[in-house]
Every structure is written in structure tokens, then in C-alpha cells.
């Protein structure tokens, strides 16, 4: 335990929290070719590769993911949620934070129903996460 005098001389340091989605916390000044501090909830990007990945040990599947070049020129891997998708190379997508626990290196999600990404067809419950419009009937 430090004494009061020690705490007066050197107060306690608060812990610095590391961001879970660092690519969303940078902007890019293309004129000066420098990164800027610009926190944003989502970013726009262009798909450079769309493919599947196998998850870590206890699970087994083919998870869909896309390699995305963001508007700040950072390349990331983003998960494509839901059943079926219409993404291909050069599709423009909106990316949000949020990792996929069983896919190493995937720390972002693609927002369904925004920009070039379609919503999930035939979805009736939990539609807002998958960009599906309310059915007419």
C-alpha cells in the first residue's frame, strides 16, 4: 500500500482500454497521405475477396467472410451474417465492429441491408440485425 505522500507525488494511473475494432478509429487524409484520429461507428468499404473459412477447434462449419478495403485504406476481414448473401468482389459494404469468437482474425461484421448488401430472404424473427423488411401479410 502506498502512503498518502506517495500518492500525492505520483497519483494512480487509470488503465488505458485498447479498442476492439481499431480500423474504425482511424481516418485517412488522402491529400497529406496521413492517418487521423477519427472514431466512427461504421465505415464504408469495398470487398476485395469473398470466401469461406473454417472455425476454431470444437466447431465445424464454412463461415462466410469478406476481405474489405475500408475508406481509410485499411484492409480487414469481416464476417457476413445470415443465410446466403449477394456479395462479390467490388461490392460496396458497410462494416461495423464486433468479432466472431470462433474465427481468428475476424473482428468486424458486415451490415446486412445497407449499400450493396441485401437483407436475408425469408427471415421473420430478429429481422433488424439482418436488414429484412417487414412481410406484408
Curated annotation (Swiss-Prot):
* Gene3D superfamilies with a match to the protein in the record: Nucleic acid-binding proteins
InterPro entries, per this entry? NA-bd_OB-fold, Ribosomal_uS12, Ribosomal_uS12_bac
GO MF annotations in UniProt? rRNA binding; structural constituent of ribosome; tRNA binding
3-methylthioaspartic acid is carried by which residues?
102
Instruction: Alphabetically list the UniProt keywords.
Output: Methylation, Ribonucleoprotein, Ribosomal protein, RNA-binding, rRNA-binding, tRNA-binding
Q: Which domain of life is it from?
A: Bacteria
Region named Disordered: 1-55, 118-137
| Gene Ontology biological-process entries | translation
Task: Please give the GO cellular component terms listed in this UniProt entry.
Answer: ribosome; small ribosomal subunit
Work out whether the entry's keyword set contains Ribosomal protein: yes
Decide whether keyword Cell division is in the record. no
Its quaternary organisation is: Part of the 30S ribosomal subunit. Contacts proteins S8 and S17. May interact with IF1 in the 30S initiation complex.
What the entry lists under PANTHER family is as follows: 30S RIBOSOMAL PROTEIN S12 FAMILY MEMBER (PTHR11652)
Family assignment from sequence similarity: Belongs to the universal ribosomal protein uS12 family.
Purpose: With S4 and S5 plays an important role in translational accuracy.
Task: From the Swiss-Prot or TrEMBL record, give the protein name.
Answer: Small ribosomal subunit protein uS12
Identify the coding gene: rpsL
